[in-house]
């Protein structure tokens, strides 16, 4: 569960008392240079207003203090530019890969087949094995009061021994704009000490703390690239 600020509410591993934990994404967003992402968002607002004359007319009618109305115009402009459609498709593809990794009997729609095939082939080509028991797990780093949800753990060559943190990304420009933020997140996950299973804490399995993987599977492109990320600085 979360508090009103979006922080995880979880027991402290030492005291057992519930407390808020800062999200790993919040820490990463604060430390990372988000200029590229912010510029992308601004461009989408411009494109959305250009596509919707009614939004332009509404904007002209507003005064600077009409903040609520202006915020609604921005949201509508982003929708008009389909700024979030890629994210929705990416979420769907992400969930499909999770089901594939769990070995579920899944009838994959034709629209996703090339992407899923590319993902599976990339794992084979790089000798990677996803541990289905270690996907979407909440981990905590008590020293800094941080919690987050790691995407998946993988093994290189064969299951067992040291695992490596992996994060599947489906955005088009994630490697171009978001790698600093992602590296910070992955460093947090790799240095976490406890795993919350919904009832109690488990110990974090042994993972590499100097490297992690970004699995880039851009929606609709039928290709998948795996990038090794240096997370030692995190």
Each PLM stretch: what is its role?
Residues 1-147:
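Metal-dependent nuclease catalytic cores that hydrolyze phosphodiester bonds in DNA/RNA
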């Amino acid at each position: 569960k979360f508090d009103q600020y979006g922080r995880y509410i979880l027991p402290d591993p030492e005291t057992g008392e519930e407390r808020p934990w800062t999200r790993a994404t919040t820490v990463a967003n604060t430390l990372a240079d988000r200029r590229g992402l912010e510029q992308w968002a601004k461009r989408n607002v411009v494109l959305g207003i250009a596509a919707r004359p009614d939004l332009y007319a509404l904007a002209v009618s507003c005064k600077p203090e009409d903040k609520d109305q202006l915020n609604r115009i921005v949201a509508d402009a982003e929708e008009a530019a389909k700024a979030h459609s890629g994210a929705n498709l990416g979420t769907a593809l992400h969930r499909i890969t999770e089901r594939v990794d769990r070995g579920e009997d899944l009838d994959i729609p034709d629209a996703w087949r090339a992407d899923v095939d590319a993902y599976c082939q990339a794992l084979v080509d790089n000798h990677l094995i996803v541990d289905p028991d270690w996907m979407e797990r909440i981990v905590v780093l008590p020293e800094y009061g941080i919690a987050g949800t790691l995407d998946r753990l993988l093994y290189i060559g064969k299951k067992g021994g040291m695992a490596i943190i992996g994060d599947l990304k489906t955005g088009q420009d994630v490697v171009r704009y978001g790698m600093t933020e992602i590296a910070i997140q992955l460093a947090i996950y790799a240095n976490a000490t406890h795993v919350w299973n919904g009832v109690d804490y488990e110990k974090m399995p042994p993972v590499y703390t100097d490297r992690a993987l970004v699995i880039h599977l851009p929606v609709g492109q039928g290709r998948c690239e795996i990038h090794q990320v240096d997370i030692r600085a995190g």
